[in-house]
């Protein structure tokens, strides 16, 4: 997305300052992958699934706007919000996904000491400000399984919030 472009431009500026050979820079930029950032995971020949660490409204908006530019059949967003964090963040993320995704699957994402269902209800409050379609599946593994099993040709499914984390 745009943040990756900005980060690459910063890297170019630093390498120029330190006189790193241009071929080294080209090779590195072509090969660099940041685990959990717009990470494509092959699960189907029919649709795309991406993992991204987007865990606030600004980063979720950025990744969804970027992926919409590819004109998917549907843009499906699977995400949750962490517990013991701002409720406002939950409302905002729900609203962003409701506006930009064609379908949202709300799930749990490290609830810490909070009830996962209460967190999901907060996210629903944000989505309810939009016309966005959604379901909630508390168990994250089940939510991901649902997204994959219901993927349609041309869809882009983004698993947002946890990036490379596996807990």
Describe these PLM feature segments.
Residues 50, 78, 107, 137, ...:
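Generic enzyme active-site microenvironment
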Residues 55-56, 81-84, 110-111, 162-167:
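Short glycine-rich anion-binding loops that position phosphate/pyrophosphate groups of nucleotides
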Residues 94-150:
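C-terminal helical cap/extension that packs against the catalytic core
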Residues 1-103, 125:
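Nucleotide phosphate-binding/pyrophosphate-handling subdomain across enzymes
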Residues 42, 79, 140, 161-163:
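A general secondary-structure junction signal
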Residues 33-36, 106, 162-165:
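Residue-level signal for pocket-adjacent positions within structured domains
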């Amino acid at each position: 997305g745009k943040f990756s472009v900005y980060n690459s431009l910063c890297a170019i500026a630093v390498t120029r300052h330190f006189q790193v050979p241009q071929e080294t820079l080209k090779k590195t930029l072509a090969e660099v992958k940041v685990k959990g950032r717009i990470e494509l995971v092959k699960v189907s020949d029919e649709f795309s699934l991406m993992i991204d660490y987007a865990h606030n409204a600004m980063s979720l908006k950025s990744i969804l706007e970027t992926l919409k530019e590819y004109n998917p059949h549907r843009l499906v967003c699977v995400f949750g919000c962490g517990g013991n964090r701002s409720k406002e963040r939950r409302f905002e993320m729900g609203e962003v996904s409701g506006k930009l995704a064609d379908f949202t699957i709300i799930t749990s994402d490290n609830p810490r000491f909070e009830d996962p269902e209460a967190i999901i209800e907060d996210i629903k409050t944000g989505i309810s400000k939009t016309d966005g379609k959604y379901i909630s599946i508390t168990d994250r593994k089940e939510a991901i399984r649902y997204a994959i099993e219901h993927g349609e040709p041309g869809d882009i499914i983004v698993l947002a919030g946890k990036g490379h984390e596996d807990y």
